[in-house]
A protein has these predicted regions:
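Domain-level detector of nuclease and nuclease-like folds
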Residues: 23-155
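Glycine/proline-rich, flexible active-site/cofactor-binding loop segments
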Residues: 1-30
Length: 155
């Protein structure tokens, strides 16, 4: 399970206020019931803030296809801070970002049947310099800063 997007220096023109995730017709994904009264957020894979240049682009980030059951502390903490850093990096060059969801043996399955990823890996390609930076997070409350999650992957 993965998602790929391009991050460029887009001007913020719209806000996400009041938006919520919706189902994509004909595709079975998690839904609002999977996030009810537990520690998981609807974690954006392609961040809403990266696509807030237009309502159309922003709206595309609010499909359940673009979210994962993400530990709330990870989503609101180190993952969010890495997303903010991406937006700084894309001020000077275009980024291609691939987010991998990893389901290790014994991954959590909720009562609703939804699968919780064990890990999330963000591969960021800096198109101007031709380099990769990769960050791997266990889907738990982080105990170190996002910078400490950088790993070496061969691409």
């Amino acid at each position: 399970n993965w998602l790929k997007y391009t991050s460029t220096n887009r001007v913020k023109n719209v806000d996400r206020g009041g938006m919520d995730f919706i189902m994509y017709p004909g595709v079975i994904t998690s839904d609002k019931h999977d996030y009810y009264k537990n520690i998981y957020d609807k974690g954006h894979l392609a961040p809403a803030a990266t696509f807030s240049d237009s309502m159309d682009n922003l709206g595309e980030t609010f499909y359940y296809l673009n979210c994962a059951l993400q530990n709330q502390d990870l989503n609101r903490g180190e993952w969010r801070m890495l997303e903010a850093e991406e937006r700084k990096w894309d001020d000077s060059e275009t980024l291609t970002v691939l987010v991998d969801l990893i389901f290790d043996e014994g991954y959590i399955v909720l009562k609703t049947g939804a699968a919780v990823p064990s890990d999330m890996i963000k591969h960021i390609y800096f198109e101007g310099r031709g380099i990769w930076k990769c960050f791997e997070f266990e889907n738990i409350k982080p105990t170190t800063g996002w910078e400490e999650h950088e790993v070496i992957h061969s691409h």
